[in-house]
Amino acid sequence: MRPILLSGHERSLNQIKFNRDGDLLFSVAKDKIVCAWWSANGERLGTYSGHQGAIWTVDVSPNTVLLATGSADNTVRLWNVKTGECVKVWDFPTAVKRVAFNPDGSRLLAVTEKRMGFLGTIAVLDINYGDSQGGGLENQADEPSLRITCTESKATVAGWSYLGKYIIAGHEDGSVSQYDGKTGEQLENVQAHEFDHQINDIQFSQDRTYFITASKDKSAKLISSRNLAILKTYVADTPLNSATITPKKDYVILGGGQAAMDVTTTSARQGKFEARFYHKVFEDEIGRVRGHFGPLNTVDVHPNGTAYASGGEDGYVRVHHFDKPYFDFMYEVEREQLRK
């Protein structure tokens, strides 16, 4: 499995994202630039420039018409994917740590930082796609249609459940909350991870009925969107920054490594800078993929389950297209199921 090495960033990666078709990969880093790549061959399509600070997060609408980014310059920007122009800027009092489109792309959530006397919030913005020719994308609402304020512990990550019914948020204190997608009312809160070990990532299954969290407490959890029941736990030996669920095969991919500031040795083995594959059902680790020089900050998987990409503290994005053995590998019990 030879990786394609994408070097378009000068500083460490913050988030990477495949679009719904899987032909494009978007990456954002601490260097104020958004890159778009062809996922098949790693060719760079272009960049989106305009942010004045590190970009923490990126998401692309389900129809690949709009791209949203959230940055340390306290703005959310909306871009026209095709032309690269910025069609809208929303200003917030603090940095924006996570943006996510709902399943039909009609709404966008933005998680803001708790700073300078402002509480952390989750703002929901209504998105307008203009006419069929791609005109009128600039006509976006100026104010959020919904604002959820996190009074207890700030939200670090968030996403939408199936049908956009719930907003699921991961918090700094290791808990996971479920909010009503329409009213913003908190319905449920579960201490999913060790107290005070923040949740660094949350990614949903393809049907959004369950999701995976990655935490500083060295574990990842598979959780139901409906009632926040913890279904599975994947234990690693290093803090986790990112986790994703693979379609086609029942695996999950976890990315992490010692925090950059804690690294004392230069051996990549020592820092555990690998992407780890676990069996989704049996919770066993089944393999690792090495390559990054420094912690993995973000992982994402191709929507067809044919490839995955990881972005690291080293400023590189590595795209791996899976080989045949990856798809052939099965547990004995899975084989028996097939024979029946």
From Swiss-Prot:
InterPro entries in UniProt: eIF3i (IPR027525), WD40/YVTN_repeat-like_dom_sf (IPR015943), WD40_repeat_CS (IPR019775), WD40_repeat_dom_sf (IPR036322), WD40_rpt (IPR001680)
Residues in WD repeats: 8-47, 50-91, 150-189, 194-233, 291-330
Subcellular location field: Cytoplasm
Entry's Gene Ontology molecular function annotations: RNA binding; translation initiation factor activity
Top-level taxon of origin: Eukaryota
A GO cellular-component term linked to this record: eukaryotic translation initiation factor 3 complex, eIF3m
Record keywords, A-Z: Cytoplasm, Initiation factor, Protein biosynthesis, Repeat, WD repeat
Signal peptide limits: none
Pfam families given in the database record: EIF3I
Listed SMART domains: WD40
Role of this protein: Component of the eukaryotic translation initiation factor 3 (eIF-3) complex, which is involved in protein synthesis of a specialized repertoire of mRNAs and, together with other initiation factors, stimulates binding of mRNA and methionyl-tRNAi to the 40S ribosome. The eIF-3 complex specifically targets and initiates translation of a subset of mRNAs involved in cell proliferation.
Quaternary structure and partners: Component of the eukaryotic translation initiation factor 3 (eIF-3) complex.
Annotated family: Belongs to the eIF-3 subunit I family.
Protein name: Eukaryotic translation initiation factor 3 subunit I
Organism of origin: Aspergillus fumigatus (strain ATCC MYA-4609 / CBS 101355 / FGSC A1100 / Af293)
